[in-house]
Amino acid sequence: MDYKKMGSRVYIRMDKGDEILSCIRRVCCDMDIKSATFQGIGACDKVVVATFIPEKQDFLRHERNGMLEMISLQGNVVTDVNGRLKEHAHGMFSYLLPDSGEIAYLGGHLQSARISYTGEIVLDVVEDGFIGQQFDAVTGIDVWKLEGKA
């Protein structure tokens, strides 16, 4: 992995074997970034996404191995109530069905993804404040808490 800050953005190049969310967290820790949004593209060889099931307050896990094009990655990094960084990302991946050669898609809440060739991520750093996190009793999930200066 390599990264460089240019303006308010950090450009991250991920290499074969890098885990996307771990790398984003490491960059944020190294650069003392409290909150940011990110987007990216690339190729992966192992992806785990999940679908939230509201009635169970739990996720249904989906895992795929093999050549997966990361056609869209979007997410954010926030600071939780204990001061820890938390990533929240959704991704969309395409892959070939082996028998037909047709393209299939896998998308959802990203739990992990391992780079197979390269990943190109743009991290937009929140300036003049930060995004925290708080529990919302109505929905039963953690939501953004918009803060002033960090």
What residue spans do the PLM features occupy?
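N-terminal intrinsically disordered, cationic/polar leader segments
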Residues: 1-31, 35, 39, 43-107, ...
